[in-house]
Amino acid sequence: MERRGFSIKTFESKKELTAWIPAIVELYNETFLENWEFNPITEAEGKVIGERLLSIADPKLIKLVMKGDAIAGFLFGFPDISEGIRRANGRIWPFGWFWLLRDMKKTRWINLNGAGILAPYRGLGVNAILYAEMEKTIRSGAFEHADLVQMEEHVLTLEDTKTMGGQIYKRHRIYERHL
């Protein structure tokens, strides 16, 4: 899919995705600079996070929007393994890994937990390109439902969810209390 000079970068293998991790970490840091709760990820942290996420990630659920050779935005999706974690009682050993692997393959839910667009490309429809491409992937695969985790104060993303016909059924808030 290409619109207004933007194209989608998809991944077929974890090896292919691994090569993009440093660029994705850099983009992630640039995208969230304006968020008050954000702490930049170092290169070493990015490598560790990337390795851990690759253990559960399906490369087809990681989407990048490209403007030429530059990354303009991203959307990450992960199979929902929460049922496997419940069945394993939160323990991997001795047999918890079985439930995690089983549910990773059998789940009908996908968690969309990580989306960002660089400031110069916001308001140009990049989010619509990402959502449309992810919807195609979800509908062509074994998934039936998607869960977008978003803070209540991120009004634009919540509006995007409503526009796409999504239903807001959870509120994620941060409370502060001085001790």
Language-model-derived ranges and their functions:
Residues 7-117:
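A conserved beta-strand-loop-helix scaffold within acyl/acetyltransferase catalytic domains
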